[in-house]
């Protein structure tokens, strides 16, 4: 019997012009940053269903941020908007001149969430950080984060700095979708087993359409803590370039005297990246190991997937 889809309601909210639709279009609709300039303002609520990892469907509510719409969300549409929410993503324009009003609307959202979906996870994105002078970004973000955490009580919120012009958008959205994957701990355990079996330094699992990182394993600390989202951004751009040439991205191998890295189609919904610090291991051996693990990870993607882990045969 085929698995039924598991729908997760995600609210995307924030003042008009804060950049909600632009980031949604980049992550889920394959826009590049410069093309988002032609997007118009969202009218009321735009619904979209994004299939993610096969059975998981993100029911994304992109809520227009004009004052009239915002007031309606908290009055006549309150129950409809805020009922059965899994995740609230609130986007703040870091250069907004109406910060007090932004915070007021955010707190109104939290009150409605507490009443209708008290278990929802809250994410705050301090957006358009590219407009802030580089030497001021850490300080400004830290101040905003402290304010948002204080205003969010008794709820917890996770804060991210974001920009459509760099990899920070992928870091934030990878963290968000990670919270929505039902069997993520089982996935991570099997990814760790897989990495240890093939003697890999790192293994990353990317969602196939968005190239968001959904799981990873590393056996030792690496110098660049932002490398995952950088890879997401680079490969997503490369995939889009391939599409413009009527070609599809299949796989990639990068190798030098210190390491070998492989990116390959893994399951019907994922790509895998394997990093080996022993470049003497033949490429063919690693690619065979990836191929042999595919069937097992295909089963894991189902909500009712197997409870056993990947072990050496």
From Swiss-Prot:
Changing residue 104 to A: Abolished interaction with TFE3 and TFEB without affecting interaction with RPTOR. Changing residue 35 to A: In RA2 mutant; abolished interaction with RPTOR without affecting GTP-binding. Does not affect interaction with TFE3 and TFEB. This is Ras-related GTP-binding protein A. It holds the Pfam family Gtr1_RagA. Its EC number is 3.6.5.-. It is found in: Cytoplasm; Nucleus; Lysosome membrane. Polybiquitinated via 'Lys-63'-linked polyubiquitination by RNF152 in response to amino acid starvation: polyubiquitination of the GDP-bound inactive form by RNF152 promotes RRAGA inactivation and interaction with the GATOR1 complex. This does not affect RRAGA degradation.
């Amino acid at each position: 019997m085929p698995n039924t889809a598991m729908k997760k309601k995600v609210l995307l909210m924030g003042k008009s012009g804060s950049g909600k639709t632009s980031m949604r279009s980049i992550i889920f609709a394959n826009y590049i940053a410069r093309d988002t300039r032609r997007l118009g303002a969202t009218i009321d609520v735009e619904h979209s269903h994004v299939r993610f990892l096969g059975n998981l469907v993100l029911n994304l509510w992109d809520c227009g941020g004009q004052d009239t719409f915002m007031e309606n969300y908290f009055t006549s549409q309150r129950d409809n908007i805020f009922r059965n929410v899994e995740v609230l993503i609130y986007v703040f324009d870091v250069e907004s001149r109406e910060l007090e009003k932004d915070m007021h609307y955010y707190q109104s959202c939290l009150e409605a969430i507490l009443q209708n979906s008290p278990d929802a996870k809250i994410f705050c994105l301090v957006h358009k950080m590219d407009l802030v002078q580089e030497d001021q970004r850490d300080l400004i973000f830290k101040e905003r984060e402290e304010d948002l955490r204080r205003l969010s009580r008794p709820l917890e919120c996770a804060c991210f700095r974001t920009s459509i012009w760099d990899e920070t958008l992928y870091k934030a959205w990878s963290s968000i979708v990670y919270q929505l994957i039902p069997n993520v701990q089982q996935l991570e355990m099997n990814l760790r087993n897989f990495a240890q079996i093939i003697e890999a330094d790192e293994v990353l699992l990317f969602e196939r359409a968005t190239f968001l990182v959904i799981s990873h394993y590393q056996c030792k600390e690496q110098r660049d803590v932002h490398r995952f989202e950088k890879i997401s951004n680079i490969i997503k751009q490369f995939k889009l370039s391939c599409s413009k040439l009527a070609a599809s991205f299949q796989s990639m191998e990068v190798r030098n005297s210190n390491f070998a890295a492989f990116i390959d189609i893994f399951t019907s919904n994922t790509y895998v990246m394997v990093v080996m610090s022993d470049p003497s291991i033949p490429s063919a051996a690693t690619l065979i190991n990836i191929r042999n693990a595919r069937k097992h990870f295909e089963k894991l993607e189902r909500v009712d997937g197997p409870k056993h882990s990947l072990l050496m045969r």
